[in-house]
Amino acid sequence: MGCIFTKPSPEQQKFDGEDYECENKKNLNLISYIRNLLFGNNSHQQLYNEIIPTTTSTTSTTTNSVYQNIGLDGYNNNNNNNNNNNNNNNIMNNYGYDDYGYSYEEDEDYYDEMPIPTIVAQPQPQPQPQPQPQPQPQQPIRIVSQNQQIPTTPPQQISQFNITGNKSPSSIGSRHRSKPKETLRAHKKRHKDGHKMVNEYVFVRKLGKGTFGKVKLAYHHDTHHLYAIKIFNKIRLKKQTMGIGRPNAFDDVLKEIAIMKKMNHINVVKLYEVINDPQEEYIYIVMEYIEGGSIMSANETSEDLARKYFRDIVFGLEYLHEQKVIHKDLKPENLLVNSEGVVKITDFGVSHIFDDDDVVRCSRGSPAFLAPELCRNESQPISGKGVDVWALGVSLYCLIFARTPFISKTNSLLDIYDQIVNHEPTYPREISNDLMDLFKRLLDKNPLTRIQIAEIKSHKWTTISGTWPMNELDHLILSVTDQEMIDAISTDHTIKPSDNTTTDEDDSDLSSSSGGESSGIIGSSNESKSMYNNVNSKQKIQNQNQNQNQNQNQNQNQNQNQNHNQNQNQNQNQNNNNNSLIEKSNISIPASSSSISNNDSCYENRNVYIKDEEMNMICNDSVIMDPIKELNKIDGLNYGCDFQIGKEYSDFQYNSGHFIYDLVDENESQISRESANDYYLPFKTNKYLNNKSIV
């Protein structure tokens, strides 16, 4: 370049214009640009544009819009070129704010956004085209502050003309990845700019909501890498039941963590860290941030781009099935695309882990994506792999036509089920014959003849008539056992809840917990055979300390035992009343939804007597309560038992029916006779037991 410059003195903080001489003054702007890259200046973008003018509209779109469309409005520079973004593949236009939804009950917390500091990621000149290397494990996106400006090469733009140039991801499906980190301390503080922090993560904004929690965008204070962090209130998770056979929603979180810990594939979202402080109410799941958002857009997608996305999904889905995981909620909202056009599967909250066969027994998932066999009122084994393949076909249909194939005319679930079971999809526009054939095989209503993953990989449309083959997977099969699900987080399993666990303030998940008695939230223990044992032992100790109070109730116990005997005799007649209960519930669900797993149990040494409004016994279980066996005969009921230790109230929850029930302790002393109408009943435990734990 022919430039000579003097070295700055130690006390100088930046280059001065007089410290260098340039033989060719045309290079002055370039030197200034380099100087500002190193030491910072607000005019760096203007200098960059002067030195490296836009040569084509495509290059301009890629350079100027990448950093404005990574899902960070507050991280844009002053040159707002959103209106000039002509990227036809819609990768950068999908911000993904609402695409981190997942299958837990909605948390009503609303994020109190603070002003976001200006953080600039400076692009550098595009290098000369080089042969495309073997794909490498993707690193988290990196952002930098004004005081630390680091050039970043813009991601490669994916278009309909170069998508076949990407190498198959199957060859790196087994690449080495460090084990996700587990942290048992959550140190909460404020960043110097006012943003909330947990450990080294600085929270920026909320990306989306799900059931029981939210997802926030954060960056690592030291590395400036971006992450998506799921935040859950463990008390709320523990208190909520998700249906018959499911004790609480915390199991779903444990299962998702266990599955993500095992996953190591380019087309599956990565888990980096789990922060689970036993003294805090919240658990934080640090995941890979996918800046492009959902693959779904408001516009129809070309077959070429849809094929590229579809192949990525097939690779990821094949990997999940090889790992004995059924996703069960495959849909565009759970298929995220990064800036390089790579699709990644996320949200394993309702996923199913199978051992010898892939049979699923419930229809948890989005109704519009349910397979016909899940919508029929039949009791037969259902292949989980076939369910995922059907959802794959519906997702491809959404990509091509920007709508779902089965739409209810009355906004009724039953109408959607009828459309799925009894009607064929329509095709709004002309598509290729190969794609039409693939749709017919993906959306085959007979699960026995529906196309399988191996056939999808060799289909003419997927491979462009064999010119773009999909290679075989090369990876190590890793199974997820039930014990690994229980041990997904290994902590001391009690926390100190806040005074009000139902607060709607968003600060609650990022502020220190107040003092209080243990709420009995359980993770797992290597010595535990059940995730509830620790709470059980504590309850037994508390029960022993309450013997004096219990002795005062002996007379009442004798009367109660007589009532129990009468109730047990009435229980023999309960089957005759089941139909009337179903009619009262006004709930109509597929038979597959009421299939029960027998691994559900509540806490030890507790009896719950539940009667209907005519005082007929519904269930009477003790020692290790398993009312599911009794309620299995009553289709549509959602029985829940979850009472927190030392809390002012807890939830006794139903989804249908009207009941009067007696709640008793392990000595069969009557605690209360209450009525439950439909969905929700707050039950005051302190009033009856003086902080004694009950379930």
Curated annotation (Swiss-Prot):
Reaction catalysed by this enzyme: L-seryl-[protein] + ATP = O-phospho-L-seryl-[protein] + ADP + H(+); L-threonyl-[protein] + ATP = O-phospho-L-threonyl-[protein] + ADP + H(+)
Skewed-composition ranges (Pro residues): 124-138
A GO biological-process term: cheating during chimeric sorocarp development
Top-tier EC class: transferase
Domain of life: Eukaryota
Stored Pfam families: Pkinase
Protein family membership: Belongs to the protein kinase superfamily. Ser/Thr protein kinase family.
UniProt-recorded name of the protein: Probable serine/threonine-protein kinase DDB_G0279405
Organism: Dictyostelium discoideum
